[in-house]
Design a protein with these regions (language model features):
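Conserved ABC transporter NBD signature motif
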Residues: 58-66
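Non-catalytic connector elements of ABC transporters
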Residues: 237-240, 249-354
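Conserved coupling/switch loops of ABC nucleotide-binding domains, chiefly the family-specific signature
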Residues: 56-59, 109, 209, 341
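ABC ATPase nucleotide-binding domain
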Residues: 5, 25, 61, 245, ...
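The feature captures the beta-strand-to-loop junction immediately N-terminal to the Walker
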Residues: 35-37
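ABC ATPase nucleotide-binding domains
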Residues: 31, 72-229
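Helix-to-loop junction immediately C-terminal to a conserved catalytic motif
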Residues: 50
Length: 354
């Protein structure tokens, strides 16, 4: 396992700056997940760590050694792609042991290492099969096994589960996390799927437009988002964001006319955005701000029900456990838990209740 230091790294493609002055520290054995929308720079950053992309400015260090000018193979890093990139004419054993052969290992050493890793990944009964004879999940495990046999100091995963169906994604999430717990190798994992990020990471790095918006433990980011982007990006359904202004008495007045005191000390007339997650809005009197709303959408998911209601001109999403008797068009009362409300500066996006 290794430490990774990204220091003031910039990546430019001609006149276009994809990543401007980014810094990040990854500790030994940490499972870091880079998450963000498509085009935010997360895969570019991963490829710079691997040596597959040049660094325009700044430096990347592994265990304190700057690797900017090192070839990918010299960095002792293994990368797993979403495409698997398996050789179709080789068996599972052949694919897994190929890099060891390139390194000059003898047949006995290759076979021993391949068999050892195959047992860890439950591939020992599939070693004689070709990739075409495997399921998507099995092919992904072979791709992981091919990396593990090299005993790298860092694993890089670039959206490895994107091509799998929903059931396999859940299974592979658990397998990758279990593998990390067993091996203890430093992992940097890229995904656009926030569920993967929340369930797998020791720390999440939320990226947007080539910059880091926030870094922290999954639940810390979920409960205490630094800004509007993180608040809206993490969570499914996403956080409700409701426009408002600060009154002369310091309360938050929402567009619907509702008024809420959050104890914020802001100038009168300031434009703010109130944020509250769907699960913190109740259909029964639990205290907090009460509002009369009309139901516009009901989505039963089995264990929970998602409702979308109109509160004045705003649409608000609510998530409740179990099922509801309400119908579309019904008028209902809702209660927003004051202790779970966040206040953001509408212009800058920065959270104010920190």
């Amino acid at each position: 396992m290794s430490t990774i230091s990204v220091r003031n790294v910039t990546k430019k493609y001609g006149a276009v700056t994809a990543i401007p002055d980014l810094s990040l520290e990854v500790t030994k054995g940490e499972f870091i997940v880079l998450v963000g929308p498509s085009g935010c720079g997360k895969s570019t950053l991963l490829r710079m760590l691997a040596g597959l992309e040049s660094i325009t400015e700044g430096e990347v260090a592994i265990d304190g050694e700057v690797v900017n000018n090192m070839m990918p193979r010299q960095r002792n890093i293994a990368m797993v792609f979403q495409s698997y990139a398996l050789y179709p004419h080789m068996t599972v054993a052949g694919n897994m042991g190929f890099s060891l052969k390139l390194d000059g290992a003898d047949k006995a050493e290759v076979a021993e290492r391949v068999n050892e890793v195959a047992k860890i990944l439950a591939l020992d009964s599939l070693l004689d099969r070709k990739p075409a004879q495997l399921s998507g999940g099995q092919r992904q495990r072979v791709a992981m096994g091919r990396s593990i046999v090299r005993d790298p100091s860092v694993f890089l995963f670039d959206e490895p589960l994107s091509n799998l169906d929903a059931k396999l994604r859940v299974q592979m999430r658990a397998e990758i996390k279990s593998l990390h717990n067993r091996l203890g190798t430093t992992i940097v994992y890229v995904t656009h799927d926030q569920i993967e990020a929340m369930t797998m990471a020791d720390r999440i790095v939320v990226m947007n437009a080539g910059t880091i918006e926030q870094v922290g433990a999954p639940l810390d980011l979920y409960d205490q988002p630094a800004n509007l982007f993180v608040a809206e990006f993490l969570g499914s359904p996403s956080m409700n964001l409701i426009d408002g202004t600060i009154s002369d008495s310091g309360t938050v007045v929402l567009g619907s006319g509702l008024e809420l005191s959050l104890g914020a000390s802001l100038r009168a007339g300031a434009e703010v955005t109130l944020g509250i997650r769907p699960e913190y809005i109740s259909l029964s009197d639990t205290g907090g701000m009460k509002a009369r709303c009309m139901v516009t959408v009901i989505e039963p998911t089995g264990p929970a029900t998602i409702l979308v209601v109109e509160m004045g001109d705003e649409k608000v999403t609510i998530e409740v456990t179990g099922r509801v008797a309400h119908k579309v068009g019904d008028f209902i009362d809702i209660w927003m838990a004051k202790e779970h409300c966040h206040l953001f500066d509408t212009s800058s996006g920065i959270r104010l209740d920190q």
